[in-house]
Amino acid sequence: MNYKISIRYDGSLFYGWAKQPQKRTVQEHLETVFKTIFKINDIKIIGSGRTDRGVHAYEQVFSVNHHQLNYEPQVIYQALCSQIDPDVQILKVQSVHDTFHAQHDAISKTYQYIINDYEFDLFKHNYEYFIHQKINDQKLLEALELFVGEYDFKSFSTSELPLTTRKINWVKITRNTRLEIYINGNGFLKNMVRMIISACIDYVFNKISLTQIKTLLTNPKKGASVKLAPPCGLYLYKVYY
């Protein structure tokens, strides 16, 4: 059977989503749990996409399909919850059609980035980006809105993929004490969100102009924008199907 499973995780102690030799990753941990519970050595899970080291997820989705997995979703859910590490939370398990693919069937994703420009909080430093200067929210939004639309994001990625065109559907910001930035798109390249956030922050503090940002979008060049916002403030917020 094929299952669609939604999870949440604290990325602080993970080396990202994808499996790496001798590293603790979310994918590796989940596959180990499946192997331990269900005694299936060739199990393979497919995520909606990768997150980097230190990046968190409010909702990541993965699919797992194996002929030896033939259980009710609630049984899978309870079994995973009993064995999963405390920095991963199982949100939902659904049985789906055999053709469902967590990555290929995703329509869009929303990322959230949290900035604290108010007061340093020791116990949240792994979960937000602390900036010592106050951010002008309207100015930040002005820069963010430049990215809405379909562009070649080669300037805003470290990806080695040959095709780097993506579409940003919408952006928004909310403010309580902390600043929360939301970016929705049909797909994201490696480090793309963090580079976008970094460029927008640089604009707020007059280190780069809107014209320079537009040039990076209209004349894409790999390595043109090399600054990255820290991973601690970034969350994969929701995956849409």
UniProtKB/Swiss-Prot annotation:
Q: Which CDD domains match?
A: PseudoU_synth_EcTruA
Q: Which GO terms describe its molecular function?
A: RNA binding; tRNA pseudouridine(38-40) synthase activity
Listed A to Z, the keywords are: Isomerase, tRNA processing
User: For this UniProt entry, which segments traverse the membrane?
Assistant: none
Q: What is its EC number?
A: 5.4.99.12
Keyword Isomerase on this protein?
yes
Taken from the UniProt record, the cysteine pairs bridged by disulfide bonds within this chain are none
Tell me which Gene Ontology terms the entry assigns under biological process: tRNA pseudouridine synthesis
Instruction: Enumerate the catalysed reactions.
Output: uridine(38/39/40) in tRNA = pseudouridine(38/39/40) in tRNA
Q: Does the keyword tRNA processing apply?
A: yes
- Which EC class does it fall in? isomerase
State where substrate binds: 111
Q: What does UniProt list as catalytic?
A: 52 (nucleophile)
What does the protein in this record do?
Formation of pseudouridine at positions 38, 39 and 40 in the anticodon stem and loop of transfer RNAs.
Q: Whom does it interact with, and what assembly results?
A: Homodimer.
Q: Member of which family? A: Belongs to the tRNA pseudouridine synthase TruA family.
Q: Which PANTHER family match?
A: PSEUDOURIDYLATE SYNTHASE (PTHR11142), TRNA PSEUDOURIDINE SYNTHASE-LIKE 1 (PTHR11142:SF0)
Protein name stated in the entry: tRNA pseudouridine synthase A
Organism in which the protein naturally occurs: Ureaplasma urealyticum serovar 10 (strain ATCC 33699 / Western)
